[in-house]
Each structure stands twice: as C-alpha cells, then as structure tokens.
UniProtKB/Swiss-Prot annotation:
Keyword terms: Cytoplasm, Hydrolase
UniProt-listed InterPro entries: Urease_gamma, Urease_gamma/gamma-beta_su, Urease_gamma_sf, Urease_subunit
Catalytic activity: urea + 2 H2O + H(+) = hydrogencarbonate + 2 NH4(+)
Pfam family, one: Urease_gamma
Gene Ontology cellular component terms for the protein in this record: cytoplasm
Gene field: ureA
Full protein name: Urease subunit gamma
Family: Belongs to the urease gamma subunit family.
Location in the cell: Cytoplasm
Biological process annotations from GO: urea catabolic process
Enzyme Commission number: 3.5.1.5
Superkingdom as given in the UniProt entry: Bacteria
Keyword Cytoplasm (UniProt): yes
Amino acid sequence: MRLTPHEQDRLLISYAAELARRRRARGLRLNHPEAVAVITDHLLEGARDGRTVAELMVSGRSVLTRDDVMDGVPEMLHDVQVEATFPDGTKLVTVHQPIA
C-alpha cells in the first residue's frame, strides 16, 4: 500500500490519538502531543462526518478538560489548527484555547 505524505500524516494523527485515548481510559493524564492528537483527530473525523467549521470550532473546546491532561498543558496549548477535508473542499479549522 502506498500512501501520500498527506495520508501518512493523517494516519499518524489517527494512531497517536487512539493511543492517547487508550492511555486516558487507563486513567493517565495526557501530555501535550497526545492532547493535540486527540483534538486534531476529533476535528478531522468531524469534518469527514459532514459537520461545519463552526460546529467543530465549538466542539473542539470540549474534547478534553484540565483533568484529562498533565499540569501545564492547557497553558502551552493556545490553538489547534488543522486543514480538514469537508464535503465541499478543504478548510482550515482553528480551535482557540481548546482545553477549558
């Protein structure tokens, strides 16, 4: 199977998010890269499901809470941006202050 660099990036994000979700299910708090992966995967899958940019910008802020991540992660994570593929094309989705 041959994947483009873009497809490889998406696959890596998906796997990193899945690993982070398993760790969270075991009661571990997520570090910065794990938190970014989970939020990014949520945005990419939401776009694939046909949700709008506005919906994803709102829902992206409720994926993780301060209790889900290690100390200091919310302060380090100001924005999460990803170019997601929607039914009508690719759009940039930005979630400001994604961890409340």
